[in-house]
């Protein structure tokens, strides 16, 4: 990556913490981002919106923000709208891309309309008859299924359901986190992958092999036995094709600059996109630093490069 004068950035806030279910992940990400930026000579400071009003950013002379918030208002367009209002440049997607990207239900609706392959699904609303909906969904989609709150990240409250009897309880648990729940047909046979996006960098696809049944919160941030395969094992031309498709899945939602697109392959190698992440984790377990490191880009270079994307607007 080309050398960047850290003075170009001015005073930078690293947004971290927040009040979503992913607060601890965000704190971990933010601390590492902060250290990486400071090591590069950037005038960076921590800022937790759960503890201080956003107006303080403008009052204290911040001109730029690295968004290390995860979930909730940090990813759903609210923080982005406030930063736009205060005239502060920020990393990641804008209001529309952030709002759509966090909402798995509406993401899948857009993808369906535009021909991006995504697993068959049904939506369940808080207050529905969970027993009746469970019977309808199993009859339509079969088993196994994944139950996901529409607007939580880091696999918070994601439940794999293998029997029809277990689905109502999974729905009852998921609606505690969101009023809309996505019930998605499980894609089996070809593995789970992610394509990391950071400007024009050509980052490798990563295959994720969790020790447990799927890549849940524990596998993402706690376990040390999750395998991340780089190279991912796909033929070079197939990997290149999937990176192009991942970029399209990201772009059609209005997402910009950097993030991730996660997908599964079935037994025949057909891809099914699950979600995008517009503010990916940046912990020592997280995927973008792993992808960057595989092509010789250090953590410090990555965070400075992501921040540098705010200079292009």
Curated annotation (Swiss-Prot):
Its cofactor is Mg(2+); Mn(2+). ATP binds at residues 138-193. Pathway: Cell wall biogenesis; peptidoglycan biosynthesis. Cell wall formation. The keyword ATP-binding applies. GO terms for molecular function: ATP binding; D-alanine-D-alanine ligase activity; metal ion binding. GO terms for cellular component: cytosol. This is D-alanine--D-alanine ligase. HAMAP family: Dala_Dala_lig. It comes from Paraburkholderia phytofirmans (strain DSM 17436 / LMG 22146 / PsJN). Mg(2+) 1 binds at residues 262, 275. Residues 108-308 form the ATP-grasp domain. Binds 2 magnesium or manganese ions per subunit. Its EC number is 6.3.2.4. Mg(2+) 2 binds at residues 275, 277. InterPro entries: ATP-grasp, ATP_grasp_subdomain_1, D-Ala_lig_Van_CS, D_ala_D_ala, Dala_Dala_lig_C, Dala_Dala_lig_N, PreATP-grasp_dom_sf. It is an enzyme of class 6 (ligase). It is found in: Cytoplasm. Belongs to the D-alanine--D-alanine ligase family. GO terms for biological process: cell wall organization; peptidoglycan biosynthetic process; regulation of cell shape. Keywords: ATP-binding, Cell shape, Cell wall biogenesis/degradation, Cytoplasm, Ligase, Magnesium, Manganese, Metal-binding, Nucleotide-binding, Peptidoglycan synthesis. It catalyses: 2 D-alanine + ATP = D-alanyl-D-alanine + ADP + phosphate + H(+).
